[in-house]
Amino acid sequence: MADLQKIVDDLSSLTVLEAAELAKLLEEKWGVSAAAAVAVAAPGGGGAAAAPAEEKTEFTVVLASAGDKKIEVIKEVRAITGLGLKEAKDLVEGAPKPVKEGVNKEEAEKIKGQLEKAGAKVELK
């Protein structure tokens, strides 16, 4: 039982990028695909529903790096996320890290613009 708890603790400490890489490695090892379940469910919606499903509606704003103006980026991260100073500083120094998840395209572009104006390098996923 202690071994299972250690596994849970180890998995909980992974970053989003590390978790995605782990998922890819497990898919290869076990010969499965996480996307297969989605592909099986999609045909039931019909051909007309397939086109809108391809357009991504939720985005994750990822801080790739803080750039030269780390203090400005920390201030902007605090304003966007509502995090405290220490949490925002840890997020910025731990880049690449997601700043905001599950936002629409318009909000994601707005956040990206704010962070880039502060000097950060940002990706939308």
From Swiss-Prot:
Coiled coil: none
Keywords on record: Ribonucleoprotein, Ribosomal protein
Keyword NAD found: no
Subunit structure: Homodimer. Part of the ribosomal stalk of the 50S ribosomal subunit. Forms a multimeric L10(L12)X complex, where L10 forms an elongated spine to which 2 to 4 L12 dimers bind in a sequential fashion. Binds GTP-bound translation factors.
Keyword Ribonucleoprotein: yes
Organism whose genome encodes this protein: Bradyrhizobium sp. (strain ORS 278)
GO CC, any one term: cytosolic large ribosomal subunit
Matches recorded under InterPro entries: Ribosomal_bL12, Ribosomal_bL12_C, Ribosomal_bL12_C/ClpS-like, Ribosomal_bL12_oligo, Ribosomal_bL12_oligo_N_sf
One example of a Gene Ontology biological process annotation: translation
Similarity-based family: Belongs to the bacterial ribosomal protein bL12 family.
Taxonomic superkingdom: Bacteria
GO terms for MF: mRNA binding; structural constituent of ribosome
Pfam family, one: Ribosomal_L12
Protein name (record): Large ribosomal subunit protein bL12
Function in brief: Forms part of the ribosomal stalk which helps the ribosome interact with GTP-bound translation factors. Is thus essential for accurate translation.
